[in-house]
């Protein structure tokens, strides 16, 4: 911890440490690869994790990994200097995913999906080749609740970003230690620390992203009720399958079997779902 930490720094240390403890994100001997994109979130994550590492007595290792995707205007000189001053082990790897994205995605469409997929593959491969068993990402509380809202409104399912995830190849654990942290606190901390932020020129120019619309909607609701974002985060930890409609998680069809009655109940279906099917229609 800094010799004289600010109130927001103390807050970040508290909530990051709590998330790590709540979800058992980091254990003794872990080699944690922190994905440092050059944005405020990843700078904050790396800084706070490094302080927690020191506080733990170096019970785990951290390593900063930055992927240079060959975007026009990319300049990591200040980033390299900052990392050297902090004495944090790191590597900046260059892979031209920018050209692939520009070639595959039509002008005006969102690049994020393909860009993140290509980036994820490179990150997993690098972690495996270099012996890192944990991959730390800088998503914060507001990312989680916005993703939840986007999934409901645009995809028709209930999902978000889990605090801890087993990768698809079953070789890594992905962790999000900032999952309890509010974005406004990250903004304040980034300003205090004067991080050498590298803007994303690819995504930043696309103002029509759904995520920005959803963020604006949540912000508007929070004006009327400031607890809206925290309530949404709590909802991710408080699912009640019996109050939803997913038949994979709750046996609605055979609830009669749970009735406490002396009468014998025959649970024969009156209707068959196939009788009411319509082509190409979704409720």
From Swiss-Prot:
Secretion signal span: none
Record key words, sorted: 4Fe-4S, ATP-binding, Cytoplasm, Iron, Iron-sulfur, Magnesium, Metal-binding, Nucleotide-binding, RNA-binding, Transferase, tRNA processing, tRNA-binding
Binding site for [4Fe-4S] cluster: 112, 115, 203
Listed InterPro entries: Rossmann-like_a/b/a_fold, TilS/TtcA_N, tRNA_Cyd_32_2_STrfase, tRNA_thiolation_TtcA_Ctu1
EC number assigned by the record: 2.8.1.-
EC top class, as a word: transferase
One Pfam family here: ATP_bind_3
Sequence motif PP-loop motif, residues: 37-42
Primary residence: cytoplasm
GO cellular component, one term: cytoplasm
Keyword Repeat: no
GO MF annotations in UniProt: 4 iron, 4 sulfur cluster binding; ATP binding; magnesium ion binding; sulfurtransferase activity; tRNA binding
Cofactor(s) this protein cannot do without: Mg(2+); [4Fe-4S] cluster
Keyword Transmembrane helix: no
Catalysis performed (reactions): cytidine(32) in tRNA + S-sulfanyl-L-cysteinyl-[cysteine desulfurase] + AH2 + ATP = 2-thiocytidine(32) in tRNA + L-cysteinyl-[cysteine desulfurase] + A + AMP + diphosphate + H(+)
Domain of life: Bacteria
Biological process annotations from GO: tRNA thio-modification
Subcellular location: Cytoplasm
Pathway: tRNA modification
Free-text cofactor note: Binds 1 [4Fe-4S] cluster per subunit. The cluster is chelated by three Cys residues, the fourth Fe has a free coordination site that may bind a sulfur atom transferred from the persulfide of IscS.
Similarity annotation: Belongs to the TtcA family.
Subunit structure as annotated in this protein's UniProt entry: Homodimer.
Miscellaneous note of the record: The thiolation reaction likely consists of two steps: a first activation step by ATP to form an adenylated intermediate of the target base of tRNA, and a second nucleophilic substitution step of the sulfur (S) atom supplied by the hydrosulfide attached to the Fe-S cluster.
Protein's job: Catalyzes the ATP-dependent 2-thiolation of cytidine in position 32 of tRNA, to form 2-thiocytidine (s(2)C32). The sulfur atoms are provided by the cysteine/cysteine desulfurase (IscS) system.
This protein's name: tRNA-cytidine(32) 2-sulfurtransferase
Organism: Legionella pneumophila (strain Lens)
């Amino acid at each position: 911890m800094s010799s004289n930490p600010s109130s927001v720094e103390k807050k970040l240390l508290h909530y990051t440490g709590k998330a790590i403890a709540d979800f058992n994100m980091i254990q003794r001997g872990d080699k944690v690869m922190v994905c440092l994109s050059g944005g405020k979130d990843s700078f904050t994550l790396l800084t706070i994790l490094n302080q927690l590492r020191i506080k733990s007595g170096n019970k785990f290792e951290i390593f900063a990994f930055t992927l240079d995707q060959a975007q026009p205007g990319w300049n990591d000189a200040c980033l390299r200097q900052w990392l050297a001053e902090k004495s944090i082990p790191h590597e900046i790897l260059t892979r031209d995913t920018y050209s692939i994205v520009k070639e595959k995605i039509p002008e005006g469409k969102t690049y994020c999906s393909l860009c993140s997929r290509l980036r994820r593959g490179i990150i997993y491969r690098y972690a495996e080749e270099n012996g890192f068993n944990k991959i730390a990402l800088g998503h914060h509380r507001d990312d989680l609740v916005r993703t939840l809202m986007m999934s409901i409104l645009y995809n028709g399912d209930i999902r978000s970003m889990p605090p801890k995830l087993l990768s698809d190849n079953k070789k890594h654990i992905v962790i999000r230690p900032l999952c309890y942290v509010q974005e406004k606190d990250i903004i304040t901390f980034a300003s205090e620390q004067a991080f050498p932020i590298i803007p994303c020129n690819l995504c930043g120019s696309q103002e029509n992203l759904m995520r920005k619309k959803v963020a604006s909607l949540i912000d508007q609701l929070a004006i009327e009720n400031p607890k809206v974002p925290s309530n949404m985060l709590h909802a991710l930890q408080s699912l009640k399958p019996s109050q939803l409609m997913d038949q994979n998680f709750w046996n609605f069809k055979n609830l009669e079997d749970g009735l406490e009655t002396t009468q014998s109940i025959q649970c024969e279906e009156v209707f068959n779902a196939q009788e009411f099917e319509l082509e190409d229609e979704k409720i």
